[in-house]
Amino acid sequence: MTELFRTPTAQKFNLDNYAFVFKRDDFKDLSKIVFKNSLGIFHLNKSKEQIISPWELKFPRDLPARTETIESIINSLQNLKIRKIYKRDAINISNFSLNPPLMELKLTDKEKNQMQIELGLVDSITNSTYIALKDQDIIYQIDSISFPLEKIDLSDFIETKIFSTTPKEIKAFKLFQRVGRTSKISKISIFKDKQNTWKNNRGQKFNSSSSIEVLNKFLNLKSTIILDEVTEKLEKKIERYTRSPLYSIIIQEEAGNEIEYKVSSLITSLPGIKMEKGQYFIVKASNRKFPFLVHKDSYSIFSLRESQIQRQRI
């Protein structure tokens, strides 16, 4: 038997001192994450503005990042219990698929301290995997990681939410519909008074749960495509569709900000975008860098009226 294929030998450590690979503070105050698997390399930075998410995807796209994915990655690495510890030598590095590793994570905190994590062989028989830290001369055998890191792709990192406000942060919500070329009518106009009671402009009180249910129908709206790669031709077409929108929403936040959302009618086509005719509409937000393309399945929410909240028929 050649030296390379020799059976790995576990090192004798007191595992009471090495119960877990990471300490809880290892993931505190992170500012940057670089994640690499077979599906791509993804760069994430902590967002300064935090309009829609506390994290931003910087590569391969420049978009708000999905918080749930990042939290799942971090949570999956916490509490990794060690089964065995092996010496980090050429034999073990090869046997445990750590040269190159199957997945890599580089974490940077606010003080610019870095931690580089390498993930290797996933052993389905023992339900375990192997993990190493760049600055250590040992390899850990651990229980298989619960979150499927190997399956994460670009779509998992992109935040598809359109609205950036929670019901608690809303002071007033208004929905308008265009009538004719320039006129518009108010479909919903509600506000929250100092006692946190929802009312309309006539002072009629609305049931709180019904009001929040309606707000959530809008706030949970998600995009099918984020139009972040815009040519001059595409930009002109988007402007044409949203210049006189069929619907518009104005949200006044408790913090004093006002956000406008323009919603087009169902559209026929967009230059360079593969789409079925009449199956999508555009949403353009005043506080977001890029417009959104949304499937018509969500279009029915714009037919809601203020009277439905009052009668609790949503």
Predicted regions span which residues?
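Secondary-structure "cap/kink" motif recognition
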Residues: 1-314
